[in-house]
Amino acid sequence: MSKFQNYYNNDDNVINYPYIDYIIKSYIPEYYVDTNRRKYVDMHIFEEAMLHVSTIYEESDKTYERLEYLGDAIFHMIITEYFYHRYNEENEGFLTRLRIRIERGDSMVELSKNLGLNNFVQIYGISLNDHILEDIFESFIGAFYLNFGMKYTRLFIIKLIEKHKNLSELIAYDDNYKDLLLRYFHQMKWGHPKYIEEIVIDPKNNQRNKFISKVKNPFDKVIGIGSASTKKKSEQLASQMALTNLGVIIDGEIDTDWINKIEKIETEATQTEIKDKKPMSVFNPNNKLLSKNTIKNLLLQYNTKLPTIDIDLKLFYEAMTHRSYLIRKNLPNRDVPKSKSIVRLQKKSNERLQFLGDAVIHFIIGEYLFNKYADSGEGYLTRLRCKLENSESLFFLAKQSDISSYLLISQNIEVLHGRENVNIIGGGLEAFVGALYLNIGLGTVKQFLLEIMRIELDINQIAENETNYKDLILQLYNKNKWGHPVYKILKEEGPDHCKIFTMGLYLGNKLMGIGKASSKKKAEQIASKKMYQNYINN
């Protein structure tokens, strides 16, 4: 008999309070002695977390997808912070690899089964599979957070991991293509692989998104492409193609001698650099240190008031230190600073704080969009979050807030326009957020980040641009059994190099919307928007 047998009814298997009570007593018994705890559990949220899209009967029916979106962001941040503290001497590459292994699909499925969630999944007309179990785990975390808050969700996840995961085995485990590509980039000192996601409606199933991932090298060249039903899998496939193109995978097998090959390439590149480049001092006269007043004023600029807590300047110095400005042994005489005002080399780079700050930003934006767009689906929320948290947006925010001017970078990086480098400057903002989170707490970070986005980014316009009205029209036609939407060219104007297209959207023979733009696709979007808004308004 299953240990969860007493907590579900074999007729409908609906998740229930006795099961939640069992989970609390098993993982966070301290919750019941907390006098400030919430006095009731909203079981409707947990029930929603178990509803697969196949159970939809009416348009108003809910599924677990929004809670899955929220749970993904929560789990990601808590695991990131946990590893950051537990492995406080390890570098960002190690932490990233370990986190990837915990967040893998098979790992999530295992955790879902450890909790017995497979007993409560509501599906119709299909068989329970690992993909659903992976989703259900994240949606359960989302529901848990909405009921019990961050404090107890963090405690629950940490105890769950410590009970069911052998971290030593995960550290030794290394067959992950994304891991290997990250190691390759680190060996080449290329920073991080840049993944670009595109989300489209899967033509085989209009209810699900299809992810297309492209991975780029530091020279902005696409080196791998992957397509799958989940973002993680598409990134794995893109990484596999990249490793093949880079010569790490040969005839489908990983070349065991690849690290030696990288080191050889690296040595040759270093020797060429020494021959070709004029030596330059690492010390950068343009660098400047953050002060407590600068940090306070920066926060006040974005309507964020500091609580009565001492600012840990060492932590913020670390957050602003690019790896090019670290202490190194045996500096040549030319590298001795000529002025006492020049900022000294630092002991730690900001890479660990970037690792943490990235996850904090991911969570804050995810939760904000979840609440702001309460009627929007997981696909839309994911696309919008990607726009707000991508490196270009973070770079823009760092420049607008002037955080970029406090990055400590070597003179060589400065000359190479390092303060205009999207990854370096965007990473600086991530690290600043990580330091702010550790020093002051989530509430202040949330207030700062949401205010800087509100003031510097037009979120409503970004959201409007992200709305794919052609997808909405397709769903509308499918729901009403109207067949397929038909777009026709009504008019073409102007010379070939500067054409203006007028497109019409038809339902049968009836013209439902007209759009005019410099491309057919844009005109179709405008026509779709007009029809959709007319349908909603009427």
Swiss-Prot record:
According to the lineage, what is the superkingdom? Viruses
The name under which this protein is listed is: Probable ribonuclease 3
Question: Which purpose does this protein serve, as stated in its record?
Answer: Digests double-stranded RNA.
Alphabetical GO biological process terms: regulation of gene expression; rRNA processing
Q: What is its EC number?
A: 3.1.26.3
Q: Which residues form the DRBM domain?
A: 408-477
This enzyme catalyses: Endonucleolytic cleavage to 5'-phosphomonoester
- What's an example of a GO molecular-function annotation for this chain? ribonuclease III activity
Question: What keywords sit in the KW lines?
Answer: Endonuclease, Hydrolase, Nuclease, Repeat, RNA-binding
Every RNase III domain range = 24-149, 238-381
Annotated organism of origin: Acanthamoeba polyphaga mimivirus (APMV)
Family affiliation: Belongs to the ribonuclease III family.
